[in-house]
Amino acid sequence: MHDVIKKLTPEQALEVVMRLSEEGGAIRNAVVAEARNVLSGIDLDQIANEVFFVLDSVDVRDCWDRAGSSRDGYTSPDEAAVELVEEQLRPFFDQAGRYHDLGMADEEATYCQGVILGIYRYEHESKSEFREWAVDIPIECAGALLTDWRERGQDSISAAAMEEFIRDRCCPHWARYFFRMGRPT
C-alpha cells in the first residue's frame, strides 16, 4: 500500500488529500492537523537559501529580452529587472499571505524573516551578471514584504522581534532604511 502512495503524481496526491478531507470527522481533522504540522515546519535558513537560489538563477539575457520596444511601449532594462525580480519573489510573498490567512502569525513572521534574509544575501553575495542590473531592487522588494506584513496587523511584540532580527541577525545595512521609512515598527 505504501508503494501506491509513493507512485502518485503531485496532482493525484492532492486529489487523495482533498477526498479524505471531504469525508469529514476524524479523517478531516487528521488531514488538517497534518497540514498544519507541515506548514509549521519552517526552516528560516532553508527559505533564505531558496530565495537566494531563485534570484541568483535569473539570467541577465532574460532582462535584455524583455527590455526594448513593444506594442505596449518601451520597457527599460531597469523596469525589466524589477519585473523579473518581482516574478521570482511572488510565490514567496503569496505564501506569507497564506500563513496570515490561516492565522499562523508566528509562522508568517518566521517565513518573512527567511525571505528577507534570502533577498539580503542575494544583494550582498550574488556574483550573477543580472545582479548588476538589479541595483536597489532587492531592498525595495524586502521593504514591500515588510510593509505587507506590518499592514496585516502585527502586534508590538512581533514587530519588535522583526526589528531585532533585521538589526542583529539579518541585514544591519538595511535596518536604517527600513526603520527610517517607518518599517516595520
Spans of features found by a protein language model:
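Eukaryotic low-complexity, mixed-charge intrinsically disordered interaction/regulatory segments enriched
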Residues: 1-19, 32
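Eukaryote-biased, non-catalytic alpha-solenoid scaffold regions
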Residues: 2-3, 22, 26-185
